[in-house]
Amino acid sequence: MARIAGINIPTHKHIVIGLQSIFGIGDTRAREICITLKLDPVTKVANITENQLELIRVEIAKYEVEGDLRRQLAMDIKRLKDLGCYRGVRHRKSLPLRGQRTKTNARTRKGPRRLIK
């Protein structure tokens, strides 16, 4: 198994799909990395040399991925909550942030119904 950015990349998948298992790397960025390094996107991860793997690691190190990205997202949400702005209040109350209706929908975000006693 190839290990990139602390994640085990599945060896039976194509390199473009395997790179997407890293948090912060989607389809566009995975294809961009393949083009930059002149790798064929449909090459299986198992067929990539150690040299190419090291080049991929160096390229991915340029981006904010995995733990750093998760931490940044958590800090952004915490900042909104601390500011007390509309989005922060909605985060605190576990309600939708972007104007969706909540009278009949948003059950996933609001959680299970609470019984009134």
UniProtKB/Swiss-Prot annotation:
GO-annotated molecular function: rRNA binding; structural constituent of ribosome; tRNA binding
PROSITE patterns per record: RIBOSOMAL_S13_1, RIBOSOMAL_S13_2
Keywords per UniProt: Ribonucleoprotein, Ribosomal protein, RNA-binding, rRNA-binding, tRNA-binding
GO biological process: translation
Superkingdom of origin organism: Bacteria
Region Disordered, residue ranges: 94-117
Cellular component per GO, a single term: small ribosomal subunit
Listed Pfam families: Ribosomal_S13
Gene3D superfamilies in alphabetical order: 1.10.8.50, 30s ribosomal protein s13, domain 2
InterPro entries hit by this protein: Rbsml_uS13_C, Ribosomal_uS13, Ribosomal_uS13-like_H2TH, Ribosomal_uS13_bac-type, Ribosomal_uS13_CS
Protein family membership: Belongs to the universal ribosomal protein uS13 family.
Subunit (UniProt): Part of the 30S ribosomal subunit. Forms a loose heterodimer with protein S19. Forms two bridges to the 50S subunit in the 70S ribosome.
Main function: Located at the top of the head of the 30S subunit, it contacts several helices of the 16S rRNA. In the 70S ribosome it contacts the 23S rRNA (bridge B1a) and protein L5 of the 50S subunit (bridge B1b), connecting the 2 subunits; these bridges are implicated in subunit movement. Contacts the tRNAs in the A and P-sites.
Stored HAMAP family: Ribosomal_uS13
Protein name: Small ribosomal subunit protein uS13
Organism from which the protein derives: Vesicomyosocius okutanii subsp. Calyptogena okutanii (strain HA)
Lineage: Bacteria, Pseudomonadati, Pseudomonadota, Gammaproteobacteria, Candidatus Pseudothioglobaceae
